[in-house]
Curated annotation (Swiss-Prot):
The keyword Acyltransferase applies. Homodimer. Pathway: Cofactor biosynthesis; biotin biosynthesis. It comes from Methylocella silvestris (strain DSM 15510 / CIP 108128 / LMG 27833 / NCIMB 13906 / BL2). One of its GO terms (molecular function) is pyridoxal phosphate binding. The modification N6-(pyridoxal phosphate)lysine is found at K207. Coiled coil: none annotated. Belongs to the class-II pyridoxal-phosphate-dependent aminotransferase family. BioF subfamily. PROSITE patterns: AA_TRANSFER_CLASS_2 (PS00599). This is 8-amino-7-oxononanoate synthase. Its EC number is 2.3.1.47. Substrate binds at H102, T316. Gene3D superfamilies: Aspartate Aminotransferase, domain 1, Type I PLP-dependent aspartate aminotransferase-like (Major domain).
Length: 350
């Protein structure tokens, strides 16, 4: 949370280490122990010799937490999405994707020969209209969404999307990079939505988990397909033992410390209440400024006050919606949350 930048000590409100597990003693010890036992790297693709026991254990743990039959670990979240989407879809298929879905989901669609259609953000009626008009023309349909949207912090209506996909014989895939560990009792966005059927649950090990890597939790058949067909699995070196060991330790903490997993959202909601903003749905809170220059200026003024808050500008976000993106963690002191809220009130016209 505390960083040095330009000789100044700042409190960061821009880091996705929501549970502050990157520096947790148990997580660091597990990474070191994994290196001592298995070495610094995996040495090869998982289909050759890179499938060390910690990866198998990690996949079993992820599947249990997500309530699926199996899981496949990838080298990163980006590698996961750019491997999963083209593996599941072909030229005779249809992909629907939320307009604000993460860039790596869009990258996955670009690697697939399937027809891709974009629906308005969280607009289930628009997605339904597309499926009603087009579904019959295609063999399979895949609907892609974030569980928690990384720039707006809002959640996808997963229960409604699940029912929609069931009605139109479509597969639903949710990217839970910003949900696991911080909502749904730590289990993520599907759990927070009441555990509707979401057959494809993807995520990352680099946010609340505090390490590095990506994963897909799904049926045993889908996971077998990924491990034998996904190019980002077959042609990538397996995740290093240290990353797998650290992730296992982090998941142990998440499963056994519910009070810790509840803190980031509580901090975000306290911030929103102080500023009169709508109640936060996740630890991510955007303060929309508008012009890129105004966002940069506000970020600089916050730094002068002792806070690191990154200005997010187009093309990362739509034109006219440049913003300060706040990410709240379990370790943020209540008084610092109150102070940064006051600083925003003084700097930004809300």
């Amino acid at each position: 949370m505390h960083i040095l930048r330009g000789g100044r000590r700042l409190i960061s409100f821009s880091c996705n280490d929501y549970l502050n597990l990157t520096h947790h003693p148990a997580v660091k010890s597990a990474a070191i122990a994994a290196i001592n036992l298995y070495g610094a790297g995996s040495g090869a693709s998982r289909l050759v010799t890179g499938n060390h026991p910690l990866l198998v254990e990690l996949e079993e743990r992820l599947a249990r937490i997500k309530g699926t039959q199996a899981a496949c670990v990838f080298g990163s979240g980006y590698l996961a999405n750019t491997g999963i989407v083209p593996t599941l879809t072909g030229a005779k298929d249809l992909i629907l994707i939320d307009e604000l879905a993460h860039a790596c989901l869009f990258a996955g669609t670009q690697l697939s020969p399937a027809k891709t259609m974009v629906f308005r953000h969280n607009d289930v009626a628009h997605a339904e209209a597309i499926l009603a008009a087009s579904r019959a023309q295609y063999r399979h349909a895949l609907l892609l969404t974030d569980g928690v949207f990384s720039m707006d912090g809002d959640r996808a209506p997963l229960a409604t999307l699940s029912a929609l996909c069931a009605a139109h014989d479509a597969w639903l895939m949710s990217d839970d990079a910003h949900g696991l560990g911080v909502i749904g009792g730590g289990r993520g966005s599907v759990a927070a939505a009441g555990d509707p059927p979401v057959p494809l649950q993807m995520g990352t090990l680099s946010k609340a988990i505090g390490g590095y890597g990506g994963y897909l939790c799904a049926s045993a058949a889908v996971i077998d397909l990924m491990k034998t067909r996904a190019r980002t699995v077959i042609y990538s070196t397996g995740l290093p033992p240290a990353s797998a060991g650290a992730a296992l330790a982090a998941l142990e903490i998440i499963e056994n410390e519910p009070e810790l997993t509840a803190k980031p959202l509580a901090k975000a909601r306290a911030f929103c209440a102080a500023l009169g903003l709508p109640e936060a749905q996740s630890p991510i809170v955007p303060v929309i400024v508008g012009a890129p220059e105004a966002a940069l200026d506000a970020s600089r003024q916050l730094a002068d006050t002792g806070f690191l808050v990154t200005a997010i500008r187009p093309p990362t976000v739509p034109a006219g919606t440049a913003r300060l993106r706040f990410a709240f963690t379990a370790g943020h002191a209540d008084e610092d949350v109150a102070r940064v809220a006051q600083a925003v009130r003084d700097i930004v016209k809300l």
